């Protein structure tokens, strides 16, 4: 198979990934592959572009390194072209409502007829099967959080709140990426492809496991946090200093001992309530939990963030300033690791945003291209799979494909 023109880089060089989906979850999976060196083809509707394009800046991050194909994959010759593309594809990712592809005639079995080794990842809110009440429903970030038990655990004591920005989309996208790579490993070993059913609510159910396990195995439900503090443990969470906010985790025997000396509670060490070897202070079960919070709040409020960071570093207490977005790119750690970078958009502008992560030492990822325009690579992709200029123009004339204007 000849690949589309692009530099060779990263651990996934030579891999062809195709995705069909809008907004965040499914495309995020595809973009991870693209930043790690895979050739990634983004399928968009012919009549209207991905709704993410209406955003002024985010698409330049979320659709960089992609090849844009505008094709009606469910109708006539457009479907034929899509199935032809599948013959040279390693991984196909689709994000839709339940078994939408199967309902429109593109089943796993049809895809495997054209490519027995194909890895197929289906990403939806409620999965490919289940009850009719849920399976075919639309879902976004907040829907998956609400249905999974994740949302009810977040927020403040007075009200649950979803975790933003779009947590369920990103977790689900990364799940699709990792699951597809696991399936690809097996497919290359056996010659037999795989179909993966990723339900966003199940992803969030798994991510929300920490406290839910206590309920499933004893009926205890963790309360929501208060003012950003850990619902269980004193000295953990968000705290106010004299000049701003920090987060901290008071965990460990020596950390508690030394911190208690600083905040005036050394006399509690070795008591029945806080015996020697205590590694965490339970804010509910320990009768001194509220007192620890009171003393810690007072001590932190009397010190600047810089003073707290310096002292906590000496005590090996995990702590960080809550950075504002304007502070990020000048932070020395960000600068040293080039966590924020710049790249050129297709119209020649400079765009700034997060760099590629994680950092591969021997086969690093790279940004080689900005977000392509709607249908920008349609002709090149169709030529790559054997279509002539006349074939492409016929698809365009029938409204089954769109090429760049």
From Swiss-Prot:
* Active-site residues (renumbered): 169
Q: List the record's Gene Ontology CC terms alphabetically.
A: cytoplasm
Its main localization is: cytoplasm
What is its subcellular localisation? Cytoplasm
Question: Per its record, how is this protein called by name?
Answer: L-carnitine CoA-transferase
Pathway membership, UniProt: Amine and polyamine metabolism; carnitine metabolism
Give the matching InterPro entries.
Answer: CoA-transferase_III, CoA-Trfase_CaiB, CoA-Trfase_fam_III, CoA-Trfase_III_dom3_sf, CoA-Trfase_III_dom_1_sf
Q: Which family does it belong to?
A: Belongs to the CoA-transferase III family. CaiB subfamily.
Q: What is any Pfam family matched here? A: CoA_transf_3
Q: Which keywords annotate this record?
A: Cytoplasm, Transferase
**Enzyme Commission number(s) from the entry:** 2.8.3.21
Catalytic function, reaction form = crotonobetainyl-CoA + (R)-carnitine = crotonobetaine + (R)-carnitinyl-CoA; 4-(trimethylamino)butanoyl-CoA + (R)-carnitine = (R)-carnitinyl-CoA + 4-(trimethylamino)butanoate
Query: Per its UniProt record, what HAMAP family does this chain match?
Result: CaiB (MF_01050)
What is the organism of origin for this protein?
Escherichia coli O157:H7
Q: Where does CoA bind?
A: 97, 104
